[in-house]
Amino acid sequence: MTVLITGGTGFIGSHTAVSLVQSGYDAVILDNLCNSSAAVLPRLRQITGRNIPFYQGDIRDCQILRQIFSEHEIESVIHFAGLKAVGESVAEPTKYYGNNVYGSLVLAEEMARAGVLKIVFSSSATVYGDAEKVPYTEDMRPGDTANPYGASKAMVERMLTDIQKADPRWSVILLRYFNPIGAHESGLIGEQPNGVPNNLLPYICQVASGRLPQLSVFGGDYPTPDGTGMRDYIHVMDLAEGHIAAMKAKGGVAGVHLFNLGSGRAYSVLEIIRAFEAASGLHIPYRIQPRRAGDLACSYADPSHTKQQTGWETKRGLQQMMEDSWRWVSRNPGRYGD
């Protein structure tokens, strides 16, 4: 079975490519490299022993999609491609709706044209909006998303759901991620965003590597045990394996299938800092800053439905997330290819 991975050279996409190949699938990658590097490709070959076909292009380009579908017998698509910086989405909403929503529409149209009616969509827990009831369960209605990034994910979920209702042959799997961190245990691939990081751990890693003098912790007065915000963190390889489990369980079943991918436990910012210090042997200086508007005190998944339906659950704990992250950062102080 051959699977097209859009955004396959990115953080989650590259780890999912590894998991796919190691699970016996053939993979094809499409990526425009706007937030990743083609230098990941030889590293994927080193890990998997396979040359994964790669196309540099945009999901909004119907011609390159038609080329891929004509040159490969694609049976399913795992769709990661999209922009994901919350702050940038507020400043440039049209960019996000154009890439994330319109791009997904073009992809769905070309899939239908090619007779490929199985898609796994990389959604996000941001679609739950500012819901304060935790844990988050799949039967909770999407909330008022706080930014265009989250809104774009909710729109694509709705669009794919409507497409499946109109053509019941489709299998649509919607995966709502929580906070992926960690790296492949080899230290060959990991998170290396272009520009400003969007997540906590890359900032911690920049402090550890000396690129930042200290970490800013936004909010020290939340109603949590240590006053800092708490989030559900998941190892990126557990997340990658969740895609395979969902595809195996529901990829051949028509309908819309919605799953949370999280650990079911929340860790505070200070817990993450302490765990990273233990893994690296380094001190991470930090300063408590005022809360950011829209940030919640605590959010985490209820992954029980996912386990019941697919058999998937997380296997890697917080310490392994930190150890793998530190191995990645310490072995790759520059950028891919530097």
UniProtKB/Swiss-Prot annotation:
Pfam families: Epimerase. One of its GO terms (cellular component) is cytosol. Its cofactor is NAD(+). The keyword Nucleotide-binding does not apply. Its EC number is 5.1.3.2. Involved in the metabolism of galactose. Plays an essential role in the incorporation of galactose into meningococcal lipopolysaccharide surface molecules, which are important for pathogenesis. Catalyzes the conversion of UDP-galactose (UDP-Gal) to UDP-glucose (UDP-Glc) through a mechanism involving the transient reduction of NAD. This is UDP-glucose 4-epimerase. It comes from Neisseria gonorrhoeae. The gene is galE.
